[in-house]
UniProtKB/Swiss-Prot annotation:
Subcellular compartments: Cell inner membrane
UniProt entry tagged with the keyword Lipoprotein: no
One cellular component (GO) term of this entry: plasma membrane
Protein name: Membrane protein insertase YidC
InterPro entries: Membr_insert_YidC, Membr_insert_YidC_N, YidC/ALB3/OXA1/COX18, YidC/Oxa/ALB_C, YidC_ALB_C, YidC_periplasmic_sf
Family: Belongs to the OXA1/ALB3/YidC family. Type 1 subfamily.
């Protein structure tokens, strides 16, 4: 791609990106308006539909239980059995990759926790404020274990015993949260289980101003598909999403990571299969917080009987391969924005290439080669058109000198020359137009994919999702853009010619702030373009010499 058209290409691309980010991308979230909530301790009675979830005030605290597996380190508070802290051990922190990334926390002015509980008409069942008892305060998944179980027991009330059981698994970000309800009384137990994610509306720490990825709650169902609801809409009492469903999931989504309560897993198991009703609920909560959860109306537990409900919680990176094995539609939380239809197959191909070379940087290089090969016929036609334009440059200059300031006659003579020489001045534009969606799709694929987060390439590139720390790739890209100017026809306008010399430097500075993976793509693309353009020019010169000699 010649420098002149590359500039047009980038301007158009970033024009589209600007329009998206300015008018369609999620904006910074305001604090919520005061929400109408039920007073603590007076939950709505269970009916034929799930009861309303209890109000959320300041988190109470008791004893902390630490659970460590090969992938996560969780802290469960015995007040309610909340997951108050969740560290992802194989994902580095933003400010220090050697430390684990903290997905859930209630420290440092942030709140992001997973809560659950049981509601009943007489408020006798344990909620997220009930004090539980545990056997130990620390659990570790041993090398010979594949699962780790943490059991919390609530004090029996009115002859009803309840246990809350967490099951952690090796090589998994799924945590199963089960309630065992054992009715020792002589009366039936009518209950609604609630599971929710509670967090503030702040952007994730370290969020880039270049990112503008979605942060907030989302719901997926087989009928409504993937539905995002912004914090701003929740604060205004708005929000369009499917509420009643016996499948899908409810989640809190942010850049690279997601937490989701799952009603129906990929193996077909559904939490709602034996329930009377299931209902998703997104709402603002007290204390400038937001709640994304699900209410499950349980069947009546008769006297002397027991009932169990098990809800999986996925809390981890938006890793495509992992999420695809957990629940239908969970991969949609990897937010490619409005170019999903292009970014998804591009990442699929990139992932396949990574499977061959086991390095995301080299996978990007191979992807660039394949994309270039796919566009080769269009590019070749473009370069042939540019080569002919370059050959006509001296005649163009003579026409300009001949007609001086009479631009109308100059344009007429120029078009006549193009017609005589069978040259299409717009012949090089089609490859640019075709590649614009590919460029934007790749931009979002690299931006949204956690697989490239903190992924190294070679030497000084330790994170393809961040800018080149030494600006070497942007400098090399500027050099290739300058080299391309010598292969292209010089502009007839002297001012435009000067601009073509300045623009490579200007755009290389702009690329200083782009992910190294994206700059790598364009650097390799430029090198391949130079090689292709040089080859086409040589072939045209050879054909011209042959025609002249004959």
């Amino acid at each position: 791609m010649d420098t002149k058209r590359l500039i047009v290409f980038i301007v158009l691309s970033f024009g589209l990106l600007f329009v998206w980010q300015e008018y369609f991308a999620p904006k910074p979230q305001p604090k919520p308006v005061a929400a109408a909530v039920q007073p603590d301790g007076t939950p709505a009675p269970a009916t034929a539909r799930p009861a309303d979830s209890p109000a959320t005030g300041k988190l109470t605290s008791a004893q902390t239980i630490t659970v460590t597996t090969d992938l996560v380190k969780a802290q469960i508070n015995t007040a309610g059995g909340d997951i108050r802290s969740l560290e992802l051990l194989t994902q580095g922190a933003i400010d220090n990759p050697d430390k684990p990334f903290m997905l859930m926390t209630e420290q440092g002015g942030r709140t992001y926790v997973a809560q659950s509980g049981l509601l009943s008409s007489d408020a006798s069942l344990p909620t997220h404020k009930t004090l539980y008892a545990a056997d130990k305060t620390a659990y570790t998944l041993l090398p010979d274990q594949n699962t780790l179980t943490v059991t919390l027991a609530a004090a029996p009330v009115n002859g009803v015993e309840v246990k809350k059981i967490f099951t952690f698994k090796r090589d998994s970000y799924v945590i199963d949260v089960r309630y065992d309800i054992i009715n020792h009384s002589d009366k039936p137990v009518d209950a609604t289980a609630y599971y929710r994610l509670l967090r503030d509306g702040k952007a994730p720490e370290g969020e880039s101003s270049m990112a503008h990825t979605f942060t907030g709650p989302a719901v997926y169902t087989e009928t409504g598909k993937f539905q995002k609801v912004s914090f701003e809409d929740l604060a205004k009492g708005k929000g369009d999403y499917v509420r009643q469903a016996d499948n899908g999931w409810v989640a809190m989504v942010q850049h690279y990571f997601v937490s989701a309560w799952i009603l129906k897993t990929n193996d077909g198991k559904s939490v709602c299969s034996s329930a009377e009703a299931c209902q998703f609920e997104l709402k603002p909560a007290a204390g400038d917080l937001y709640s994304a959860g699900v209410l499950v109306k349980l069947p009546v537990v008769a006297a002397g009987q027991q009932y169990s409900i098990d809800m999986p919680l996925y809390a981890g990176p938006e890793d495509t391969r992992r999420m695809a094995t957990v629940a239908p539609g969970l991969v949609l939380t990897k937010d490619y924005g409005w170019v999903t239809i292009i970014a998804t197959p591009l990442f699929w191909l990139l992932d396949k290439l990574y499977g061959l070379v086991h390095n995301w940087g080299w996978a990007i290089v191979l992807l660039t080669v394949l994309v270039k090969a796919a566009f080769y016929p269009l590019s070749a036609a473009s370069y042939r058109s540019m080569a002919k334009m370059k050959a006509l440059a001296p005649r163009m200059q003579r026409l300009k000198e001949q007609y001086g300031d009479d631009r109308q006659k100059f344009q007429q003579a120029t078009m006549e020359m193009y017609k005589t020489e069978k040259v299409n001045p717009l012949g090089g534009c089609l490859p640019i137009v075709v590649q614009i969606p590919v460029f934007i799709g790749l931009y979002w694929a690299l931006l949204a994919s956690v697989e490239l987060r903190q992924a190294p390439w070679i030497l000084w590139i330790h994170d393809l999702a961040k800018p080149d720390p030494y600006y070497i790739l942007p400098a090399l890209m500027a050099a290739t853009m300058y080299l391309q100017t010598f292969l292209n026809p010089p502009p007839a306008d002297p001012l435009q010619a000067k601009m073509m010399k300045i623009m490579p430097l200007a755009f290389s500075v702009m690329f200083f702030f782009f992910p190294a993976g994206l700059v790598l793509y364009w650097l390799v693309n430029n090198i391949l373009s130079i090689a292709q353009q040089w080859w086409v020019n040589k072939q045209i010169e050879k054909d011209a010499a042959k025609a002249k000699s004959s």
